[in-house]
From Swiss-Prot:
Entries under Pfam families matching the protein: DUF4470, DUF4471
Region (Disordered): 328-355, 485-522
Descriptive protein name: Dynein axonemal assembly factor 3
GO cellular component: dynein axonemal particle
UniProt cross-references to InterPro entries, sorted A to Z: DNAAF3, DNAAF3_C, DUF4470
Family named by the database record: Belongs to the DNAAF3 family.
Keyword 4Fe-4S: no
Keywords attached to this entry: Cilium biogenesis/degradation, Cytoplasm
Functional summary from the UniProt entry: Required for the assembly of axonemal inner and outer dynein arms. Involved in preassembly of dyneins into complexes before their transport into cilia.
Location(s), subcellular: Cytoplasm; Dynein axonemal particle
Length: 540
C-alpha cells in the first residue's frame, strides 16, 4: 500500500538531524542588560537557553563559533530530548568538536563529523573512532567526578539514575558490545524502511526522489541540493560521500534507537532505524553560508552542492570551536592562562571551556520543569523543534523570563507535508505560542523557517490548548513517544528465536519512557533486534 502524500511518515519518530539551518542563539536572544544579574563566579552576564528537540547540537556549535562577535557571556544550554540516543549523539558530537587538534587535525575532524552525523554507513577509520570514543564515554557516565574532570562542559546531574544506566548501555552498544554486522544491519533496515514508506512506488523511487527534491525542497529554498547526492542518500543513507563509495560499509550505530514492542505478551526492546528518510541532513549546514560565493549560480544552476557547502561550513565552524581545545590544554599552565586572559590575541573567541555548560534534562520533563524554582522564569531563550511543538504549553512558557524570546522551528523542509498543511501547522504554532504567553516579535524579519515570539508580561498558566482546524495535521503527527507503536506490516520484522513473532501495540502506563530506559539498560543480549521499523502514526 502506497503511503499517501502528507502523512508525515518520512520524518520518522526519532530525529537525528534538524530540519532548519543552524542559528546563532545570541543573535536570537534579548540584548544584554548592563544592569542585569551577572554570574558572581565568572563576573560575566549569563545566557540561559532551553532547547527542546534540537537533537544534533548545531545551534550550540554555531553559537560557540560566533561568540567572538558578541560581548563576553557565560552560556548555560539546557537540552531536553525525547530519547537517550539523541543525548548520546550530543555528547559524541561535542567531544569530537572539542577534540584536541594535536590528536585529530581539522580536516579529519570535519570529515568524521559529517559521516557520524549524517551517514548511515561509515568508513572503517571513522567507525573505529566512534567505538573508541563510545568506550570512553561509557566509562565516564557512571563516574560523575571523573566525567566533570574530563568533560567540564557537560552536566548529567539532572538525569535520573535509570537514564544514566540506559545512556551507558547506548554507549556500550556503540563501542561494539554486540559483535557482528547483524547486531545492526543498517543497509537492510534502511531498504526495508524505504520499501514500506514508498509501497508500490518503490520501483520508481528515483522518480519519487527527483519529484520531492525539485517540486518541494527546491521550491522551498533548498535549490543547492543536487539531484545525485539527494538520490544517493535516499537509496543508501549516505549523504556525504567524501571517499569512494566502496569505502562506506560499516553501519553507523549512532543512528540506532530502541522501541518497546509486545512479543508473545511480553515487553521487549527492539532496535532499528526510525529516523528521517525523506528530507535528509542537508538543510542544517548545507543551504546557507556566510561566504556568498558558495551560493553562486551559473546558467541557473548552483556552482556548489549542498554536500560541498556543508563540508565548508562545518570545517569553518570547527576551526572556531578549536579555540576551546587550545584553552583546555593551557589550563595546566596558570601563568600562560593569566597572560592570555590579560591580553587576548586578535580573533580569539570570547569564551573558554569553562564559559559554557550543556545540561541534559530528564526525558519527558517539559510539563514539570516549572515546578522547580531553579527553572521557573529562568530562560532568556526557548527553542522548540518542529517535532516537539506539541510540548509548547503555558507550563513550559512559565520557564521563560519576562521579555524572553521563543524560537519555533517550522516544518518548511518536511517534504511529506503539502503547502496547505504547512500553513495550518504555522497557524497552530502561533495559537500554541499565544496560549503559552508569547506574542509575535515586533520587527522580526520574515521567515518561513522559524517563527519568533517574545514573552508577554501578563502571561499566566491556565490557558487552554488551541483548537485544531479540520484538515490540519496534528502536531503530534511529527513526534510521538517511542512506545506509541502499532503492528508492523507482515514480512517486515525479523523472527526471534525461530518462528514468526506477532507484533502488537504495547500499552504502557504514563511512565513508559522510564520503563524503556530500564529495558535498554539491561545487558545488550536481552535486546531484541527488529529487521525494520514497525508501522506507526509517526514513521514507517
Amino acid at each position: 500500500m502506497t503511503t499517501p502524500a502528507g502523512s508525515g511518515r518520512g520524518f520518522g519518530s526519532v530525529s537525528w538531524w534538524g530540519l532548519s539551518p543552524a542559528l546563532d542563539l545570541q543573535a536570537e536572544s534579548p540584548p544584554v542588560d548592563p544592569d542585569s544579574q551577572a554570574d558572581t563566579v565568572h563576573s560575566t552576564p549569563e545566557l540561559d537557553v532551553l532547547l527542546l528537540g534540537s537533537v544534533d547540537g548545531r545551534h550550540l556549535l554555531r553559537t560557540l563559533s560566533r561568540a567572538k562577535l558578541w560581548p563576553r557571556r557565560r552560556f548555560n544550554f539546557f537540552a531536553l530530548e525525547n530519547n537517550l540516543e539523541a543525548v548520546a549523539r550530543h555528547m559524541l558530537i561535542f567531544s569530537l568538536a572539542l577534540e584536541d587538534p594535536e590528536k585529530m587535525g581539522l580536516q579529519e575532524r570535519s570529515e568524521t563529523f559529517l559521516e557520524v552525523w549524517g551517514n548511515a554507513l561509515l568508513r572503517p577509520p571513522v567507525a573505529a573512532f566512534v567505538r573508541a570514543q563510545a568506550d570512553l564515554l561509557a566509562h565516564l557516565v557512571p563516574e560523575p567526578d571523573r566525567l566533570e574532570e574530563q568533560l567540564p562542559w557537560l552536566s548529567l546531574r539532572a538525569l535520573k539514575f535509570r537514564e544514566r544506566d540506559a545512556l551507558e548501555a547506548v554507549f556500550r552498544f556503540w563501542a561494539g558490545g554486540e559483535k557482528g554486522p547483524e547486531a545492526f544491519p543498517m543497509s537492510r533496515l534502511w531498504d526495508s524502511r524505504l520499501r514500506h514508506y514508498l509501497g508500490s512506488r518503490y520501483d520508481a523511487r528515483h522518480g519519487v526522489s527527483d519529484w520531492d527534491l525539485r517540486m518541494k525542497l527546491h521550491d522551498r529554498g533548498a535549490q543547492v541540493i543536487h539531484t545525485q547526492e539527494f538520490r544517493r542518500w535516499r537509496d543508501t543513507g549516505v549523504a556525504f560521500e567524501l571517499r569512494d563509495s566502496s569505502a562506506y560499509h560499516v553501519p553507523n550505530r549512532t543512528l540506532a534507537s530502541g522501541r518497546l514492542l509486545s512479543y508473545r505478551g511480553e515487553r521487549v526492546a527492539a532496535r532499528g532505524y526510525w529516523g528521517d528518510i525523506a528530507t535528509g541532513p542537508f538543510v542544517a549546514f548545507g543551504i546557507e553560508a556566510d561566504d556568498e560565493s558558495l551560493l553562486r549560480t551559473s546558467n541557473g544552476q548552483p556552482v556548489k552542492t549542498a554536500g560541498e557547502i556543508t563540508q565548508h561550513n562545518v570545517t569553518e565552524l570547527l576551526r572556531e570551536v578549536a579555540a576551546w581545545g587550545r584553552a583546555r590544554a593551557s589550563r595546566g599552565h596558570p601563568e600562560e592562562q593569566q597572560r592570555s586572559e590579560a591580553s587576548p590575541e586578535p580573533g580569539t573567541p570570547a569564551s573558554t571551556p569553562e564559559s559554557f555548560t550543556v545540561h541534559f534534562l530528564p526525558l519527558n520533563s517539559a510539563e514539570t520543569l516549572h515546578h522547580k524554582s531553579c527553572y521557573n522564569g529562568r530562560f532568556q531563550l526557548l527553542y522548540v523543534a518542529c517535532g516537539v511543538v506539541h510540548l509548547l504549553s503555558p507550563e513550559l512558557g512559565a520557564c521563560v523570563a519576562p521579555g524572553g524570546n521563543l524560537i519555533v522551528e517550522l516544518a518548511r523542509y518536511l517534504v511529506d507535508m503539502r503547502q496547505e498543511q504547512l500553513q495550518g501547522f504555522n497557524t497552530q504554532v502561533g495559537e500554541r505560542a499565544q496560549a503559552a504567553g508569547f506574542a509575535p516579535q515586533t520587527g522580526a524579519r520574515p521567515s518561513e523557517t522559524f517563527a519568533r515570539f517574545c514573552k508577554s508580561q501578563d502571561s499566566a498558566l491556565g490557558s487552554t490548548d488551541p483548537a485544531v482546524e479540520p484538515g490540519t495535521p496534528s502536531l503530534d503527527v511529527l513526534a510521538q513517544p517511542l512506545e506509541a507503536s502499532s503492528p508492523a506490516p507482515e514480512g517486515l520484522t525479523q523472527p526471534l528465536q525461530g518462528g514468526t513473532p506477532h507484533w502488537e501495540p504495547c500499552q504502557l502506563p504514563s511512565e513508559s519512557p522510564g520503563s524503556l530506559s530500564e529495558v535498554l539498560a539491561q545487558p545488550q543480549g536481552a535486546l531484541a533486534l527488529s529487521n525494520c521499523e514497525s508501522h506507526s502514526n509517526t514513521g514507517v
